[in-house]
Amino acid sequence: MKAFLILEDGTVFEGTSIGSTKEIISEIVFNTSMTGYLEVLTDPSYAGQAVCMTYPLIGNYGICHEDQESLKPWPDGYIVRELSRIPSNFRSEDTIQNFLKKYDIPGIAGVDTRALTRILRKKGTMNGMITTNAAYNLEEILPRLKAYTTGKVVEKVTCTETHVLEGNGKRVALLDFGAKDNIAQSLNRRGCEVTVYPAATSAETILASDPDGIMLSNGPGDPKECTAIIKEVRKLYESEIPIFAICLGHQLMALATGADTKKMKYGHRGGNHPVKDLETGRVYISSQNHGYVVDTETLNPEVAVPAFENVNDKTNEGLKYTGKNIFTVQFHPEACPGPQDSGYLFDRFLEMMEVNQ
């Protein structure tokens, strides 16, 4: 069956329908990872977005549920150049097309994803529609595309109940704004007992549990939409408990302490982004997935100073908080998919908790 990807600038790509045949409107973004498509699909940070994979062949090793970063896929839609319909992998349990159908997610194959990516890089991230309706009306569709917003998506992806990953070491409170499983697993593998809390949990509840450390997770959407959460993060900042924040959590901490964030032209999404440690000068290759960034010009150096920056575009990739046991990063040290270069940051967090005892 034919499918169409329609961008808000009027560009139309024709391809073949994969997954569900329902019609969706979403923010179109691109990911440059060559592998790890299942981890991308199950990353809650993609809620409210349709993902274009720039690598030309997707699906060749199938679906291995053990590798999922959450229980289900989160993107509104999926865009690929060529879909491998016969995966070759002894671990494979399903195909991408079946996986998308199961969760009612529409996709389109046969799209010139390099051309699409060039458009998004030149004009910036834009909204789009995936449809199987060949009689589409651009005059009717384009105003709808321009009016679309992702809105408050954290509440859609956070856990509904508190749950615990047992451990014999430090006790960490993880606020789930759309956390990838490997954040909690990275702590648990280091012996930590990790208690995962819903995003709307009050700071008082977190602090009453007397954790050794607090982790603020990744998540989807515009951080400025999380007004209630930002107020609670401010209370956590004022405590003396060590805090480590990743991605959206990094942005929320910045907003909670008086800095500002801004939307990027097309964001960073992939497993090959170089970041520089500004203290040592060392460069690490990182996994990233964000469309917003902390505006370093709005930082108060008495509160926080840049700790990492992106080598390519010099945007902020991390902050160190003055006089506090708090550090935050924009990238993903848990990787999955991506390199493990910055996994040492979890060890730094453990050391911080140990010293704070």
Can you say where each PLM-predicted feature lies in the sequence?
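RNA-binding accessory domains that recognize and position tRNA/RNA substrates
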Residues: 1-204, 208-209, 223, 336, ...
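A glycine-centered loop/beta-turn motif at secondary-structure junctions
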Residues: 318-356
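Catalytic beta-strand/loop cores that center a nucleophilic Ser/Cys/Thr
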Residues: 282-323, 357
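Active-site glycine-centered loops adjacent to acidic/histidine catalytic or metal-binding residues
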Residues: 112, 247, 290, 332
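Cysteine-nucleophile active-site neighborhood
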Residues: 213, 218-285, 293, 338-353
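Hydrophobic beta-strand scaffold residues
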Residues: 106-107, 194, 243, 261, ...
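Residues that mark the start of a beta-strand
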Residues: 169-173, 193, 242, 285, ...
